From Swiss-Prot:
Gene from which this protein is expressed: metK
Protein name: S-adenosylmethionine synthase
Biological process according to GO: one-carbon metabolic process; S-adenosylmethionine biosynthetic process
Binding positions (Mg(2+)): 19
Family note: Belongs to the AdoMet synthase family.
SUPFAM superfamilies: S-adenosylmethionine synthetase
Pathway(s) the chain acts in: Amino-acid biosynthesis; S-adenosyl-L-methionine biosynthesis; S-adenosyl-L-methionine from L-methionine: step 1/1
Origin organism lineage: Bacteria, Pseudomonadati, Pseudomonadota, Betaproteobacteria, Burkholderiales
HAMAP family: S_AdoMet_synth1 (MF_00086)
Length: 387
């Protein structure tokens, strides 16, 4: 983002959004497999519609997993336990149609070598990581607060304080930037699925007072801030009944809310041999440590790969003029301190663990979950000393 005055908007969605239901099922299946077989190859795709879940993709594993039960358990945990909500975990149909990974891909990824770190990338592609000093977790403010809003909606729904809330919700936050810094919230949009008997005036008041205002620190919400709550006037039909959900349809919500480019590859349902996921996590790890080291206020990292080749084709750093040393010098430090080969990333971030279901809602980045190794800033001191 350029250093001037502008408005910038990001959105998030709740765990009950149909695309996020699909993401969470895909990652729950990945975790169930990894619990038994951490060397499995998994590309688990999910479609969910009214009363129907379809599981497809490619899985090569020695694990014995009840995929149908994993899907039902995930839907129940999200809160879809009544047909009136759009899908019911007890009665929905679950169809399973998994194949094995293509041997043509496997020969490049699993190629035996004296140096096992030379495992090839599972596909070609480009990935981005980003960090900035706008929030405590070094994330852009609009997406960070958009996540907070739908997390609070879920919290108030689950603990019964607002019992008329239902699982599906979306948020959108527009910040006003002055000299490249977020100074106030211009507009908040929050749409939440609700019980049919609750009035729109009651929804409007509760959402503003109990969800929106507590999600922001003092000073960001001003008398000028505009609130748009359920702008269509009614949101009873939601979840997979309102829209068909698909894995990988919320890649900007999953990352930085549009604050930096996206390579196009989704995360959920993919084991870490897929650089779409693992290299994007590594790029975030790199960018966050660069900012934490004080080498820049903003840092964007691009990496790219060729299928079957271990070394990244490029590692490019862009600090948008905020770096205290040249971007090329930061990129050189990155190459010296981070192993961005696919297997190097897996080892560096300890990715062969059943940790992925947590990532599938409320963002893969900017969260202080102990399993999220890519959020650590343990390399910051090394980078600072080397600079």
């Amino acid at each position: 983002m350029a250093n001037n005055d502008f408005l910038f908007t990001s959105e998030s969605v709740s765990e009950g959004h149909p695309d996020k239901v699909a993401d969470q099922i895909s990652d729950a299946i990945l975790d169930a497999i990894f619990t038994q077989d951490p060397n499995a190859r998994v590309a688990a795709e999910t479609l969910c519609n009214t009363g129907l879940v379809v599981l497809a993709g490619e899985i090569t594993t020695t694990a014995n997993v009840d995929y149908i039960q994993v899907a039902r358990d995930t839907i129940r945990r999200i809160g879809y336990d009544n047909t009136d909500y759009g899908i019911d975990y007890k009665g929905c149909a679950v169809l399973v149609a998994y194949d094995k990974q293509s041997p043509d891909i496997a020969q490049g990824v699993d190629r035996k070598s004296e140096d096992y770190l030379n495992q090839g990338a599972g596909d070609q592609g480009l990935m981005f990581g980003y960090a900035c000093d706008e929030t405590p977790d070094l994330m852009p403010a609009p997406i960070w607060y958009a996540h907070r809003l739908v997390q609070r909606q879920s919290e108030l729904r689950k603990d019964g304080r607002l019992p008329w809330l239902r699982p599906d919700a979306k948020s959108q936050v527009t910040f006003r930037y002055v000299d490249g810094r977020p100074v106030e919230v211009d507009t908040v949009v929050l749409s939440t699925q609700h019980a049919p008997e609750i009035s729109q005036s009651a929804i409007h008041e509760a959402v503003i007072e109990d969800i929106i205002k507590p999600s922001f620190p003092e000073g960001l919400i001003t008398p000028r801030t505009k609130f748009l709550v359920n702008p269509t006037g009614r949101f009873v039909i939601g979840g997979p009944q309102g829209d068909c959900g698909l894995t990988g349809r919320k890649i900007i919500v999953d990352t930085y809310g549009g604050a930096c480019p996206h390579g196009g590859g989704a995360f959920s349902g993919k084991d870490p041999s897929k650089v779409d996921r693992s290299a994007a996590y590594a790029a975030r790890y790199v960018a966050k440590n660069v900012v934490a080291a004080g080498l820049a206020r903003q840092c964007q990292v691009q990496v790219s790969y060729a299928i079957g080749v271990a070394e990244p084709i490029n590692i490019t750093v862009y600090t948008e003029g905020t770096g205290v040393i040249p971007d090329e010098q930061i990129a050189k430090l990155v190459r010296e301190h981070f192993d961005l080969r696919p297997k190097g990333i897996v080892n560096m971030l300890d990715l062969l663990r059943p940790i992925y279901a947590k990532t599938a809602a409320y963002g893969h980045f900017g969260r202080a979950e102990p399993e999220f190794s890519w959020e650590a800033t343990d390399k910051a001191l090394e980078l600072k000393k080397s600079a």
